[in-house]
């Protein structure tokens, strides 16, 4: 299996759409694999959007100016939403709508702060995973390893395309709401001094606010989507690395063919490989700890608030559908992380089984046997995606959250009745 030919593309549009073109090229060529890991491509997308705040980007005046500009736009949008709350007091449906988008913007702001603080450390992790991806595998495991890398890349890209399709569709619906809901003049309910948001009093200011709202939220939701894909893809690459390790272990005896020296070298290499995965996992959990905590709190708030608003707006189907979409997107976001966290933990548990299958008590010296025992013992502890003190991201805890949401829904339904 070969990598696609590398072409020098530095334009922002090439960077932004690069992973989609790459996935199509890999899909069309059965023997080809991606030139880079998903996290590498998503980092390029963030650079194309002009909001990846590592030391390299901070040295570019044009990029810094752009970051200040869009940050001011986001802060202005948040301030106008807060100012608009005063008009929604007494109307549960509109107040809930304002709070949903205020919470979303606060979440985006937190992600911006996170990247400003940890972009350099993320670069180190991405580069380490990129190096692992390009390691050459020799022996009987070669074909299966390359096919695994290709399949993982295509599956994740299919998920990214699906996620972005829903995200952009949602934004288009929100931007178009003033055209089919008479009571709404802007995509998001805001209030400005001197009634600048009123189209009958200030038509030019209204158009500027409308365009600013639409472009700012479209930009930052796309940015947020890329950021989430990057975060998940880091753990997905660790999952892929664990899968590659398992494949190599299951082909270890066939590769060495009784050569004890080769067996010892390969076993030590794989032990160090496993140790590197553990260290990268610990580093990722440390970096994302605050982001995970904020993410779980925001998801719980959005789901609970959306459930309440769906019940409160049951006499207004259009508003109820809008909140239902928000709730489904929030649950989709949480399930996105939970599923990949679950895959990561389960794949890490397979390593101990693969080491056990590779162990042959009739082959090797005592030092080799001790190495196998050490490897099996260490691999029995599963790796997890976790934010202390919260439980790990997996499907079991995801179902627990769904049960809590259902309990809240029941209480709210009884209260409103």
Swiss-Prot record:
Q: How does it sit in the membrane?
A: Multi-pass membrane protein
* Residue intervals annotated with topology Cytoplasmic: 1-62, 120-152, 228-290, 338-393
Q: Which residues cross the membrane?
A: 63-83, 99-119, 153-173, 207-227, 291-311, 317-337, 394-414
Q: What is one process in the GO biological process aspect for this record?
A: detection of chemical stimulus involved in sensory perception of smell
Q: How does it assemble?
A: Interacts with Orco. Complexes exist early in the endomembrane system in olfactory sensory neurons (OSNs), coupling these complexes to the conserved ciliary trafficking pathway.
The protein's UniProt keywords, in alphabetical order, are: Cell membrane, Membrane, Olfaction, Receptor, Sensory transduction, Transducer, Transmembrane, Transmembrane helix
* Keyword tRNA-binding carried by entry: no
Name the species this protein comes from. Answer: Drosophila melanogaster
Q: Which Pfam families match?
A: 7tm_6
**Source lineage:** Eukaryota, Metazoa, Ecdysozoa, Arthropoda, Hexapoda
Localization annotation: Cell membrane
Which ranges does the record list as Extracellular topological domains?
A: 84-98, 174-206, 312-316, 415-417
Role this protein plays: Odorant receptor which mediates acceptance or avoidance behavior, depending on its substrates. The odorant receptor repertoire encodes a large collection of odor stimuli that vary widely in identity, intensity, and duration. May form a complex with Orco to form odorant-sensing units, providing sensitive and prolonged odorant signaling and calcium permeability. Involved in olfactory communication for modulating aggression through the sensing of the male-specific pheromone 11-cis-vaccenyl acetate (cVA).
Task: Please give the chief subcellular localization of this protein.
Answer: membrane
* Domain of life the protein comes from: Eukaryota
Task: Quote the cellular component terms of the Gene Ontology held in the record.
Answer: dendrite membrane; plasma membrane
User: Further notes on this entry?
Assistant: The atypical heteromeric and topological design of the odorant receptors appears to be an insect-specific solution for odor recognition, making the OR/Orco complex an attractive target for the development of highly selective insect repellents to disrupt olfactory-mediated host-seeking behaviors of insect disease vectors. Odor-evoked OR currents are independent of known G-protein-coupled second messenger pathways.
Kindly list the GO molecular function terms attached to this UniProt entry: ionotropic olfactory receptor activity; odorant binding; olfactory receptor activity
What this protein is called in its record is Odorant receptor 65a
Query: Which family does the record assign?
Result: Belongs to the insect chemoreceptor superfamily. Heteromeric odorant receptor channel (TC 1.A.69) family. Or49a subfamily.
How is expression of this protein distributed across tissues? Expressed in olfactory sensory neurons in the antenna.
């Amino acid at each position: 299996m070969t990598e696609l030919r590398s072409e020098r593309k530095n334009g922002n549009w090439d960077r932004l759409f690069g992973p989609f073109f790459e996935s199509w090229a890999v899909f069309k060529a059965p023997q080809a694999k991606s030139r880079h890991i998903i996290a590498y491509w998503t980092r390029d997308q963030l650079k194309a959007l002009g909001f990846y705040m590592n030391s390299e980007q901070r040295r570019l005046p044009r990029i810094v100016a752009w970051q200040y500009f869009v940050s001011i736009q986001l802060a202005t949008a948040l301030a106008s939403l807060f100012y608009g709350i005063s008009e929604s007091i007494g109307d549960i449906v509109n107040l809930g709508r304002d709070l949903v988008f205020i919470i979303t913007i606060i979440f985006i702001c937190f992600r911006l702060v996170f990247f400003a603080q940890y972009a350099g450390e993320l670069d180190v992790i991405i580069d380490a995973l990129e190096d692992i991806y390009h390691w050459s595998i020799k022996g009987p495991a070669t074909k299966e390893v390359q096919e695994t890398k290709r399949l993982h890349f295509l599956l994740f890209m299919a998920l990214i395309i699906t996620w972005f399709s829903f995200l952009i569709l949602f934004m288009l619906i929100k931007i178009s709401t003033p055209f089919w809901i008479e009571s709404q003049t802007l995509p998001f309910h805001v209030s400005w001094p001197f009634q600048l948001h009123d189209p009958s009093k200030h038509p030019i200011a209204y158009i500027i606010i409308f365009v600013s709202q639409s472009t700012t939220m479209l930009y930052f939701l796309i940015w947020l989507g890329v950021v989430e894909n990057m975060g998940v893809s880091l753990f997905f690459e660790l999952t892929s690395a664990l899968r590659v390790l398992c494949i190599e272990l299951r082909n270890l005896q066939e590769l060495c063919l009784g050569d004890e020296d080769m067996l010892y070298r390969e076993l030590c290499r794989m032990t160090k490989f496993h140790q590197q995965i553990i260290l990268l996992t610990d580093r990722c959990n440390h970096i994302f700890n605050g982001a995970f905590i904020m993410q779980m709190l925001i998801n719980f708030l959005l789901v609970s608030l959306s459930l309440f608003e769906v019940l409160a707006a049951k006499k207004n189907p259009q508003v109820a559908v809008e909140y239902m979409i928000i709730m489904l997107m929030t649950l989709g976001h949480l399930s996105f992380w939970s599923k990949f966290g679950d895959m990561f933990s389960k794949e890490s548990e397979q390593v101990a089984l693969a080491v056990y299958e590779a162990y042959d008590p009739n082959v090797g010296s005592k030092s080799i046997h001790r190495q196998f025992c050490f490897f099996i013992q260490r691999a029995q502890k599963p790796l997890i995606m976790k934010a202390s003190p919260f439980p790990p991201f997996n499907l079991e805890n995801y179902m627990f959250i769904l049960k809590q949401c259902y309990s809240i829904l029941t209480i709210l339904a009884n209260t409103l009745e």
